[in-house]
Amino acid sequence: MNQYAVWGNPIAQSKSPRIHTLFGQQTGKAISYVAKLGDEQQFEQQLKQFFAEGAKGANITAPFKERAFALADLYSESCLQAEACNTLKRLDDGRLYADNTDGVGLVSDLARLGWPKPHQRILILGAGGATKGVLYPLLQAQQQITIYNRTADKAASLAKKFAKFGQIQSACFDELPEQSFDLIINATSLGLQGKCVELPARLLTQANIYDMQYAPNMQTPFLEYARSQGATQYQDGLGMLVGQAAYTFQLWEDVLPDVEPILKQIKQEMEF
């Protein structure tokens, strides 16, 4: 039985063990997948020991994605561009292969929703690790991206770094009301403090709204604010979570699970 785990701190809230257990049942793959609390001082040693004991792979979540990236030997292109990994696979020769499936998870969920269009205008809120993880796949899909971040220099720096891959720019908050977007993605962590970026109502009512965070009945702070401003097309990030997990599972077990029934089951379990 192949051994896997998700590492983070905190980690008790993670849905990943449940998702991967359901993937294993659906595909007939015998796996073990558990949550592991990473130690701020000992994370590298913990991860090395985990693989030394025979584990086949690991998911990495906050705050360890950059540190796990540094431990790998080989990288996918999306992982290299994000400079952070959410997935590690131990190869037969013992080397660690790093991938970042967040971007493909987002792109696949947008496709599931029927939202992607060629050259659509996307506003991404935030310039942290969550944004870095999805920019390369979005630009590969020929999307036009604007990044807004409270620290303008950080957004400008990120836009400059990814400019070689497609159309991307940064914008100050005062510039946003003058623009129009087809899709607005919240990639900030403000929701963890019960806050959100309060965009003008005109932007929220004219675009599809996507929050990378998720909650029962899609009641994240950002989506609740968007609804209060008249937004009618919105979705939380649960589908992205299940989607990225599916591509991780494929990397490990060579079979891509069917996301839809697992997403439906996880959503039902969250709401009851």
Swiss-Prot record:
What Gene Ontology molecular function terms does this protein carry?
NADP binding; shikimate 3-dehydrogenase (NADP+) activity
Active site, UniProt feature? K65 (proton acceptor)
Instruction: Write out the residues that bind NADP(+).
Output: E77, G126, A127, G128, G129, A130, N149, R150, T151, A152, D153, K154, M212, G237
Enzymatic class? oxidoreductase
Looking up CDD domains in the UniProt record yields: NAD_bind_Shikimate_DH
Question: What EC number(s) has UniProt assigned to this enzyme?
Answer: 1.1.1.25
What does it catalyze? shikimate + NADP(+) = 3-dehydroshikimate + NADPH + H(+)
Oligomeric form and interacting partners: Homodimer.
This one is known as Shikimate dehydrogenase (NADP(+))
Gene (UniProt): aroE
